[in-house]
């Protein structure tokens, strides 16, 4: 697989949508093709003041810490807690995250990799906001002007009931609302929607989307830098030298 520049790819979706599985398959496919990949987890590698935010959230909202599983469900209280002052505070934090994201991408792009892959992106934070509010949509559009747009931004759609069973952390009603927010955001930022599919089919869908994007990139490059024409020929077919 050939590539002409660094590609930025992100995976987003509700908790339990199967992002980790698809990211592992995607990165494995790229590495098997001889490409160099940098993988970043948004919360661990990008988010500003991550420890402070987690500690403050646990102390203020009294939710559980960790990752939920079918045999060990938990009750998280963080992004599902909403109020006007929390929205204002989150908007400020997301601005800091945007600056951090630009710095992380810039450093990675200079490291010689072919692909930069994100397990969640700033899109996942923006989906926590009330996108039905006109002022918030204006804020989102403004913020999006300053962050790198992924070449491929995958949104893994999932049935809320099935996702909640796989990863029981939030109330089902919130998961439904969160899914709707993602779908609304996907129309705002032109994400590639991966429909709810069996794992193997979703993996194939992602690979096909990648192949189409690479083909389009190569076509765009050829249109921008067309191959030089061969030597001019005379009427009898002999080559004619050309001079400038």
Predicted regions and their residues:
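Conserved lysine of the Walker
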Residues: 19
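NTP-dependent small-molecule kinase module
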Residues: 165-244
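Hydrophobic anchor at the beta1->P-loop junction of P-loop NTPases
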Residues: 11
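P-loop (Walker A) phosphate-binding loop of NTP-binding proteins
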Residues: 14
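Hydrophobic positions on the alpha1 helix immediately C-terminal to the Walker A/P-loop
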Residues: 22
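A glycine- and Lys/Arg-enriched "phosphate-lid" helix/loop adjacent to the NTP-binding pocket
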Residues: 115, 120-184
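ATP-dependent small-molecule kinase phosphotransfer cores
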Residues: 44-131, 138
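Post-Walker A helix-loop "phosphate-sensing" segment adjacent to the P-loop in P-loop NTPases
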Residues: 28-39
């Amino acid at each position: 697989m050939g590539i002409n520049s660094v590609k930025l790819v992100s995976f987003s979706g509700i908790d339990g949508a199967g992002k980790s599985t698809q990211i592992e398959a995607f990165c494995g496919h790229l590495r098997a093709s001889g490409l160099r990949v940098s993988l970043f987890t948004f919360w661990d590698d990008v988010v500003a003041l991550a420890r402070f935010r987690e500690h403050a959230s646990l102390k203020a909202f009294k939710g559980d810490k960790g990752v939920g599983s079918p045999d060990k469900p938990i009750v998280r209280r963080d992004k599902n807690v909403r109020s006007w002052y929390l929205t204002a505070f989150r908007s400020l934090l997301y601005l800091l995250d945007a600056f951090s994201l630009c710095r992380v991408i810039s450093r990675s792009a200079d490291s010689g990799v072919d692909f930069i892959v994100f397990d969640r992106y700033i899109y996942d934070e923006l989906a926590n906001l009330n996108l039905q509010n006109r002022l918030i949509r204006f804020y989102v559009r403004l913020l999006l002007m300053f962050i790198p747009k992924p070449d491929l931004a995958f949104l893994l759609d999932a049935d809320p009931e099935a996702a909640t069973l796989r990863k029981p952390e939030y109330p089902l009603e919130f998961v439904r609302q969160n899914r709707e927010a993602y779908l609304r955001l996907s129309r705002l930022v032109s994400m590639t929607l991966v429909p709810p599919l069996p794992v193997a089919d979703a993996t194939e869908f992602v690979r096909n989307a990648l192949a189409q994007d690479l083909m389009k990139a190569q076509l765009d490059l050829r249109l921008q830098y067309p191959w030089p024409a061969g030597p001019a020929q005379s009427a009898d077919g002999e080559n004619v030298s050309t001079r400038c």
